[in-house]
Amino acid sequence: REIYLGPLYASLENLCMSNDDAVAAQFDPEKDDDAAEEAAAVAAFAQNPDDISMEFPGENQVCLHVSDAYQAYAAEMGYTAYLDFFWMKNAFLIDYLADTIRGEGYQLGIISSKDGFVRCLDETGEKEYQYPLYHLSGNEIQSHGTMTYEGPKSIVFFHAYQAGSPDTYRYYQYQDGTMRTPYLSASDGKDHTAASELLVYSGEYGCADTLLAAFFDYQAESLSGESLKTLASQKIY
């Protein structure tokens, strides 16, 4: 239900655009009481389907239902959006493009975004593709070789640091090294990461389904071998 954290993603963008730590802290629920209260309130609304939910009546229509209580709170806070795919957006866009392109008969090549999503369309198995691997060591992002693969694949790269230009307004690093990331949880409205990075891939699912399956594991206190085995049993590696 993280897509219902739209107001908090807007606050996170303000945090990440800050010029110094004092300004950033005003938008940080870990450092500011008002921001913490807001994060808890929005998360409580986001968790409850009675407060916010989507309905798909058909004919390419979608209806967003928002409770009177949430509408009143949003008006008081000056919110302009309830819904935002934020860092997840390109996973859904790439899947849409891949399905559209395949529907027109194209089955070669890859579609990728700079923020860590890849969809390989090649069903021939005749060509190898590569994905670069990185690891954060201290404050340095180090190259750790490449992953070679073939055949249809969806790749999702979770990372707790800025890995490219799209991350500029999604991450913020304080002077003491503390990092804020876009991986907000609907449980409390705060960001959580289990490791500096996690790369998952699947030959069975698109980017969006792969992301959704692995997201909660990446938000845990630490990466669990058992949870990764569960993902593997679902053909997500």
Regions found by a protein language model. Name each.
Residues 1-237:
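Mature catalytic core of soluble alpha/beta enzymes
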